[in-house]
Amino acid sequence: MLEKYKNSKKLSRDLPQINDRIKFPKVRVIDDEGEQLGIFAPEAAIQLATKQGLDLVLVSDKSDPPVCRILDYGKYKFTQEKRAREAKKKQHNSSIKEVKMRYKIEEHDYKVRINQASKFLQSGDKVKATITFRGREIQHSNLAINLLNKMAADLVTIAEIQQAPSRDGRNVIMLLSPKKVN
């Protein structure tokens, strides 16, 4: 029994503030054409909305007084959901893909890594190029930096350097991001 009560309380907080759910002493009212009608008590604004066969919907509670709009709530909710779906379609979650290699890499292996990185960049992901060292190889970190600069030069048509080659412990790291298409 207690479980139902908790859930019902949570649901009532998530409900949109329309008509009788608006609990402010005064609200600024905008009609369905977008014209300001003035500041009203919520009861008077609700009567005005019901005369037109529409709903009073709280648009912004951050301003003083809160802004309410007279509109068809069903249509308003549909357009909000449609906008959210469109925004979700356009959104691309770019993740960071890593390409690892050693500073003594052979030419063919290097080309394979370049191809991997270019595929990642073309799909809109960022690429973290990492060169790892073992033992005393760390003395040759300048060779690794030169190799990463060569990689950036080979990918200059599709990528831009977001983080220049730098040492990070036993690694040298560079971060590339896809170029913005205008």
UniProtKB/Swiss-Prot annotation:
Pfam families associated with the record: IF3_C, IF3_N
Signal sequence interval, chain numbering: none
Record has Protein biosynthesis as a keyword: yes
Primary location: plastid
One biological process term in Gene Ontology: ribosome disassembly
Entry GO MF terms: ribosome binding; translation initiation factor activity
Keyword presence, Hydrolase: no
Compartment(s): Plastid, Chloroplast
Top-level division of the source organism's lineage: Eukaryota
Listed InterPro entries: T_IF-3_C_sf, T_IF-3_N_sf, Translation_initiation_fac3_CS, Translation_initiation_fac_3, Translation_initiation_fac_3_C, Translation_initiation_fac_3_N
GO cellular component: chloroplast; cytosol; membrane
Keywords: Chloroplast, Initiation factor, Plastid, Protein biosynthesis
Functional summary from the UniProt entry: IF-3 binds to the 30S ribosomal subunit and shifts the equilibrium between 70S ribosomes and their 50S and 30S subunits in favor of the free subunits, thus enhancing the availability of 30S subunits on which protein synthesis initiation begins.
Family: Belongs to the IF-3 family.
Assembly, per entry: Monomer.
Protein name: Translation initiation factor IF-3, chloroplastic
Phylogenetic classification of the source organism: Eukaryota, Rhodophyta, Bangiophyceae, Bangiales, Bangiaceae
